[in-house]
Amino acid sequence: MPPIPPPTREGVTTTTPVPLHWCRYTPTAPRSGLVVLHGGPGAHHEYLLPQLLFLAEARDCLLYDQRGGGRSKTDDRTPITWHTHVDDLTAVLAECAPGPLTLVGYSWGALLALLYTLEASAGRAGPMPARLVLLDPAPASRAFRATFEAEFARRQAGPEVQALRAALDASGLRERDPAAYRQRTFELSVAGYFADPDRARDLTPFRVTGRVQQSTWESLGDFDLLPALRTLRVPALVVHGRQDPIPLASAAAVAEALGARTCWLDDCGHVPYVEQPAALREAVTRFLDDTEGLVTG
């Protein structure tokens, strides 16, 4: 795994109820700006790196740890909801990324981008995005989420992952090298997200704050974003791996509702920036280049 380069700048927000850690990667002459939303909820931005830093080769990229995860943890036990995340994003944009808005969301971050856009369209958030890049978006409805949960559980309990777990248990690695054992344990915990479980070794490790994840999903209730998404008029790209445990049908329904450009990746699960980085880069770069006039005027 290549090291994560230091950001151009970093700090914490001063306008959110809880200070949120942010960082930005800025090229010498950025064409425009992107706000990148990590998955989870309850995770942090670093597991998107270093692979997604191709986004910062031509554009300023702002990333932040959403409330309750990473370096934005809080001792406040007030439940964090999807409204919390949308309100935080609104404040982060006003403080750190004023001007024409491009949201790049991965997994839960893509769903957050959609929730924010719906709220913005109703006048309950900040500015409307000029464009959206949605990478392997989280399920767009409770029904699609149930399908994902069942498929991920099936993969994790399947013979391939179970054989890898048995090999780890028999290896003696826990005693010989506890750090390597923890790394391998992490890899096996996310193996079901990948088309090839061995590729999990190339993902930067991360932790999810369970209470944040639980309270956020619970706050969505029996959700279905698709009818509301059909009312939006925003240029978008939806990228999804064909072997993602999140149903391709969910991503396709989001794309249909938005009238979005699509890119379905073969031999790819939920982590395209690890599994198919070249194809991902080509699709995202082409979309951003084609729509640059929307943010540069």
At which residue positions do the language-model features occur?
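Conserved HGGG/HGGXW glycine-rich cap/lid loop of the alpha/beta-hydrolase fold
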Residues: 18-74
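Active-site loop/oxyanion-hole signature of alpha/beta-hydrolase fold enzymes
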Residues: 66-108, 282
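Conserved hydrolase catalytic core segment
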Residues: 99-147
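Flexible "cap/lid" loop of the alpha/beta hydrolase fold
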Residues: 126, 130-172, 208-209
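Conserved alpha/beta-hydrolase catalytic His-Asp/Glu region
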Residues: 165-219
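Short beta-strand/loop motif that positions the catalytic acidic residue
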Residues: 232, 238-240
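Conserved alpha/beta-hydrolase "acid-adjacent" motif
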Residues: 245-250
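Catalytic histidine-centered segment of alpha/beta-hydrolase-like enzymes
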Residues: 268-281
